C-alpha cells in the first residue's frame, strides 16, 4: 500500500480523526502503527512499532508523511524488520482504523 492508496481509500477518508491505526498481518499478528514516522528514502515511509499508536489526525499532520511523495510505499517496522504493506484493505470500527494485509 502506498500513501495515495491510503489517502484515497473511502474507509480511511470517512474514519474519525481520533481513531488509532492498527496493522493486521496475514498471519494475524496485530501491530500498532507506531507514532514515529520516517521517510529517509525517496519512495518509502516507515512506521516504527512503538507502544503509542498514531491516530489518523496525527498522521495527516505529520511533517514526514506530508513531505513524502504520493507513490511512497508504506512499511511497518517490526523491531528492526521492515514489513512491506503490499496488498491491503482498510476497515474501520468504533475503536480503530484497521489496515489488513491480504
Where are these regions (language model features)?
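Short, intrinsically disordered N-terminal pre-domain segments
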Residues: 1-5
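Detector for the mature cores of small, proteolytically processed
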Residues: 12-102
